[in-house]
């Protein structure tokens, strides 16, 4: 990833800058940026060949002697003999010689130096050509020397002085340019490193941003799911609360129903107890009447019995009528009530057993009669023992008197 970012960070302007810095680092100060050179020697040769401003200035300020013109003519006549290689550099030779003569005339000093010292880093072809031209010029100037013109030593000293000064200037310029190039190279490397760091930081921040966006989307999905779940749970909670309210209402209704049923049960129990007590009283009265009838049958006073029963009918009806709303006065006593209950239960059991034993005989002679007919009193002239034991009585005797039915 970092390698890709580094490759992307290289732009075309960097390549072009590197190409310019490596290929053509030096430019001509007079021609401008469109004229650039690969090395200082090429720039120096260009300046010497194309821009000779000092020579032109000296030529305009000073007047040349006729001997100088003759010397130039002689040198120009000897130049075609040097061949094709020396033809391109003939102009340089004339300019150098005229420059040396003018300088020696104006200043008039000389130094013993060698005329063949050349500047370092000059092309080999230029050095050879310049040396050959100087040798040829010296050989031509030797016989033409005159007392009024500068000598060869003065010319050589001036050339050496100019070369030394030019070399020092070029070296200073070279050092300055090299320092500036080194400084710019360091700054460029520093800026490139900073740019790479910024690119790496930008890529890292981009990755972090993408990661944050991904986490944000995941959290948004989780929040949406949580909101949906909360909504579903709220709906379920509402439904549960409504169902709970319905159940509570049902429970309240059921409690009311149970309370009403309990009240009805209590009332029913009370009514049943009253009914049983009334029934026991009636059974007790029937038992007393039966005992009385049996005692009358045993004594044989049937007539008195019928009259007595007719006289006792109102008294027997009274307890029954009173039992509907009021109990009999005898049953109000607790001891008598317990006694009556025990006697009533024993009598009911006894009557049930007797009925079960007499039912087959009754089915042979006549159809079954109602239980009330079993306790029907005998009429006048009718034997009571037969009616109790065997129920052998005629069909005409089945008619019940109204008084006996009301008693039971």
UniProtKB/Swiss-Prot annotation:
Protein localization: Cytoplasm, Cytoskeleton, Microtubule organizing center, Centrosome
Keywords from the named record: Coiled coil, Cytoplasm, Cytoskeleton, Metal-binding, Neurogenesis, Phosphoprotein, Zinc, Zinc-finger
Signal peptide: none
Assembly description: Homodimer. Interacts with NDE1 and NDEL1. Interacts with DISC1. Interacts with PARP1. Interacts with MCRS1.
Function: Contributes to genomic stability by preventing telomere dysfunction. Involved in the morphogenesis of basket cells in the somatosensory cortex during embryogenesis. Involved in the positive regulation of oligodendrocyte differentiation during postnatal growth. Involved in dendritic arborization, morphogenesis of spine density dendrite, and establishment of postsynaptic dendrite density in cortical pyramidal neurons. Involved in the regulation of neurogenesis. Negatively regulates neurite outgrowth. Involved in homologous recombination (HR) repair pathway.
Record's GO cellular component terms: centrosome; cytoplasm
Consequence of gene disruption: Basket cells with reduced branches and short processes in the somatosensory cortex of adult knockout (KO) mice. Reduced expression of the gamma-aminobutyric acid-synthesizing enzymes Gad1 in the somatosensory cortex of KO mice. Delayed myelination in the corpus callosum of KO mice during the postnatal period, but recovery by adulthood. Decreased dendritic arborization and increased spine density dendrites in cortical pyramidal neurons of adult KO mice.
Modified residues (Phosphothreonine): 176
Protein name, as recorded: Protein ZNF365
Chain positions of all zinc fingers (C2H2-type): 26-51
Transmembrane feature ranges: none
Residue numbers of Phosphoserine PTMs: 16, 139, 146, 370
Entry comment describing in which tissues the protein is expressed: Detected in several tissues, with highest levels in brain. Also expressed during embryonic development. Expressed in cerebral cortex, hippocampus, striatum, inferior colliculus and thalamus.
Induction: Induced by gamma irradiation.
GO BP annotations listed: cerebellar molecular layer morphogenesis; dendrite arborization; dendritic spine morphogenesis; gamma-tubulin complex localization; mitotic cytokinesis; negative regulation of neuron projection development; positive regulation of oligodendrocyte differentiation; regulation of DNA strand resection involved in replication fork processing
Coiled-coil residue windows: 170-298
UniProt GO molecular function: protein homodimerization activity; zinc ion binding
Principal cellular location given in the protein's record: cytoplasm
């Amino acid at each position: 990833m970092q390698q890709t970012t580094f490759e992307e960070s290289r732009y075309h302007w960097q390549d072009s800058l590197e190409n310019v810095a490596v290929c053509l680092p030096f430019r001509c100060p007079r021609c401008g940026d469109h004229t650039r050179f690969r090395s200082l020697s090429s720039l120096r040769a260009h300046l010497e060949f194309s821009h000779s401003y000092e020579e032109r200035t000296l030529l305009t300020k000073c007047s040349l002697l006729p001997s100088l013109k003759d010397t130039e003519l002689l040198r120009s006549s000897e130049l075609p003999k040097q061949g094709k290689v020396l033809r391109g550099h003939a102009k340089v030779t004339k300019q150098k010689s005229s420059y040396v003569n003018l300088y020696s005339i104006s200043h008039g000093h000389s130094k013993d130096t060698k005329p063949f010292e050349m500047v370092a880093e000059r092309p080999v072809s230029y050095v050879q050509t310049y040396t050959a031209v100087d040798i040829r010029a010296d050989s031509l100037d030797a016989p033409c020397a005159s007392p009024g013109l500068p000598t060869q030593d003065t010319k050589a000293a001036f050339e050496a002085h100019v070369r030394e000064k030019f070399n020092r200037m070029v070296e200073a310029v070279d050092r300055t340019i090299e320092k500036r190039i080194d400084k710019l190279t360091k700054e460029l490397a520093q800026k490139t490193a900073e740019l790479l760091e910024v690119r790496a930081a930008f890529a890292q921040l981009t990755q972090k941003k993408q990661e944050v966006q991904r986490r944000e989307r995941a959290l948004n999905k989780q929040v949406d799911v949580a909101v949906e779940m909360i909504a579903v749970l709220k709906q379920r909670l509402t439904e549960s609360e409504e169902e709970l309210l319905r159940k509570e209402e049902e429970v309240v209704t059921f409690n009311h129903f149970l309370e009403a049923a309990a009240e009805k049960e209590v009332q029913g129990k009370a009514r049943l107890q009253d009914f049983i007590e009334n029934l026991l009283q009636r059974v007790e009265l029937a038992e007393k009447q039966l005992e009385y009838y049996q005692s009358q049958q045993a004594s044989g006073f049937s007539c008195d019995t019928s009259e007595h029963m007719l006289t006792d009918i109102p008294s027997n009806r009274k307890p029954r009528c009173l039992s509907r709303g009021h109990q009999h006065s005898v049953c109000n006593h607790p001891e008598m009530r317990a006694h009556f209950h025990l006697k009533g239960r024993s009598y009911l059991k006894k009557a049930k057993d007797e009925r079960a034993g007499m039912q087959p005989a009754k089915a042979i002679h006549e159809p079954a009669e109602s239980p009330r007919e079993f306790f029907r009193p005998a009429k006048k002239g009718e034997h009571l023992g037969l009616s109790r034991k065997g129920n052998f009585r005629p069909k005409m005797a089945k008619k019940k008197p109204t008084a006996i039915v009301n008693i039971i």
